[in-house]
Each structure stands twice: as structure tokens, then as C-alpha cells.
Amino acid sequence: MKSTSKIYTDKDSNLDVIKGKRIAVLGYGSQGRAWAQNLRDSGLNVVVGLEREGKSWELAKSDGIIPLHTKDAVKDADIIVFLVPDMVQRTLWLESVQPYMKKGADLVFAHGFNIHYKLIEPPKDSDVYMIAPKGPGPTVREYYKAGGGVPALVAIQQDVSGTALQKALAIAKGIGATRAGVIPTTFKEETETDLFGEQVILVGGIMELMKAAFETLVEEGYQPEVAYFETINELKMLVDLVYEKGITGMLKAVSDTAKYGGMTVGKFVINEDVRKRMKEALQRIKSGKFAEEWVEEYGRGMPTVVNGLSQVQNSLEEKIGNQLKDLIQKGKPKS
């Protein structure tokens, strides 16, 4: 098992490395808004690049950030930060960034997908690096304003200048990440582990596990309302415990009956066959097969995603969950 020997913090980073450089943040969604405001509040020169004037444009202006059309934002930028969705980045790069960016400008990413799978092929004279915060944009902003920061990953793909790591850590400091800690990785590792986590546990795995457990109880004649509470709703409490105290802390917090049942039946359900399928899923990611399929799916208008979402929305567990929302919210203490 390999482990990192270095975690970068504030003492390893210096904003002076990028002071005076113009930073163009492309996109003003969850991460874009947080990054732009945090970098601005750290005393850096920030503009936002957007494809059109709309809600995001007006929001940036109301936040005190200068919005520009993407072409105008990148032409004078020393550092270009891609914070638009993965599947928009290639088109944005080809149409609005590559033809207009100045020679030698840095390219920065928050996720390695487009670089790792070569959807974007950067110029050979650009530094290319990644800062990947391990939290959503609003949390990145909230923690920064409170004097803290969200941990992040850092990776260097191209280091033409010899100072790519220093600049990456300066960006990390600018968004508050070095207050918590920044872990070195690679574009390959970040991309493959991120996709794997989404597919086998965070989205795909947990969704199908909840669905299968709920349907098993309902098929055996149990009330769907009771099944929903036991297989879906209570998950939040357990995840919160793991988040706050780790798996050991969660186990200590549940009943002895739950501990024994979990430790014996858990391995029966998540058995060697499941682990084998997880490895198969990982191989699809590593080989580029998943990326190839996803690019094709996106180009066809995402029919699998659209149909899948419709099925979930019309499922019994979703209908029961919607019916129980008022009951669940009713018991929450008023703040």
C-alpha cells in the first residue's frame, strides 16, 4: 500500500508567486463562484470568463467580480482555470480558449478527466496543473470566509517553467485549501479514483444498494413506508457518523445487534463476486472504455441518463420518499 509522505499547508505556499498575474476563472457555477471570490479576497487579480451574458454574468457582477466573454478573459490571462463541467471543456477549449490564449499561459483544472483522456491536448509551452478541492463550491467558500479551508489534491501534468508546483500551491492557498492540507497526486490517479468512487459507491453503488434493499422488503410484504425508513432515510445518520468519527466511531455508536449483523451479513452481501465486479469497473475506467462510452453518450443527448432519471423519479421508493418528506421535516428542530 502506497501512502503520500507529504501534505502541503500554508507554510509550503506563497501567494507572491502569482501576485500580479491575471487569473481567468472559466465558469461561475458552484466551484467557479467560490474560487473566484476566494482568490479575489486573497488579493489576487481575477476575472471570470463566460460564454454568454445571463444569470451567471449578473451574479458575478453582483459579487464584485468582473465578467468577460471567454475569448476576452483568456487573451490577457496568465493563468486559465477550467471550472465548467467536464463535457463542456473540450468544446470551450477548441472554440474559445486555444485560439485566443496568450503563449505560455498556465492551464489549471479541478478534475483530471479532460487531460487524462486527452480530450484537451495543451500546448507544450504551458504549465498544466490541478487543484481538486474535496468539497462542493459553497463549502469551499463558507470555510474560507470562516478562516478555514477544504482539503484538496494537487497534481502537475506539465512543468515547463519549473515552478508549476509553487504556482499550484499558491492557487490552493488562494482558495483556502492549504489551511487544511493539500495532498499530492497525479491526473491519472485523481481521475480514475474519482470516477471509481462515483460509480461503485457514491452514486451507482449506494443507489442500487438502497433500491435493492427497499424492493426486497416490499416484495416480502413489508409496508413501503417502513421499508423506506429502514433502507434509505436512516442512511444519512450513519454517513454523518462515518464523516465525523470514522467507521470505528460509527460502529461504536450503533447497537451491539447492529454491529454483529453488519459484520456478519455485510460480508455475505458484499462478497467476493461484488469485489470482482468492482475491479472490472475499475478496469473499464483505466482502459478508457468508460470515457469513450460517456463521450459518445453525451454526444447523443445522454439518453441513458435521461431514461434512468425518469425511472428513478417514477419508482415506488421515490414516491414514498416524497410522501414522507413532510413527516421527516416536521420533526426537525427549528433553528
Curated annotation (Swiss-Prot):
Give the family from UniProt: Belongs to the ketol-acid reductoisomerase family.
Query: So, what pathway does this thing act in?
Result: Amino-acid biosynthesis; L-isoleucine biosynthesis; L-isoleucine from 2-oxobutanoate: step 2/4; Amino-acid biosynthesis; L-valine biosynthesis; L-valine from pyruvate: step 2/4
Q: Which cofactor names does the annotation list? A: Mg(2+)
**Which protein are we looking at?**
Ketol-acid reductoisomerase (NADP(+))
Database matches in InterPro entries: 6-PGluconate_DH-like_C_sf (IPR008927), KARI (IPR013023), KARI_C (IPR000506), KARI_N (IPR013116), KARI_prok (IPR014359), NAD(P)-bd_dom_sf (IPR036291)
Reported function: Involved in the biosynthesis of branched-chain amino acids (BCAA). Catalyzes an alkyl-migration followed by a ketol-acid reduction of (S)-2-acetolactate (S2AL) to yield (R)-2,3-dihydroxy-isovalerate. In the isomerase reaction, S2AL is rearranged via a Mg-dependent methyl migration to produce 3-hydroxy-3-methyl-2-ketobutyrate (HMKB). In the reductase reaction, this 2-ketoacid undergoes a metal-dependent reduction by NADPH to yield (R)-2,3-dihydroxy-isovalerate.
Residues engaged in binding Mg(2+) 2: D194, E230, E234
A Gene Ontology biological process in which this protein takes part is: isoleucine biosynthetic process
In this protein, which residues make up the domain named KARI N-terminal Rossmann? 5-185
Q: Where is the active site?
A: H111
Q: How is the cofactor bound?
A: Binds 2 magnesium ions per subunit.
Reaction(s) the record says it catalyses: (2R)-2,3-dihydroxy-3-methylbutanoate + NADP(+) = (2S)-2-acetolactate + NADPH + H(+); (2R,3R)-2,3-dihydroxy-3-methylpentanoate + NADP(+) = (S)-2-ethyl-2-hydroxy-3-oxobutanoate + NADPH + H(+)
Domain of life, per the record? Archaea
Q: Which residues bind substrate?
A: S255
EC number of this enzyme: 1.1.1.86
* GO MF annotations in UniProt: ketol-acid reductoisomerase activity; magnesium ion binding; NADP binding
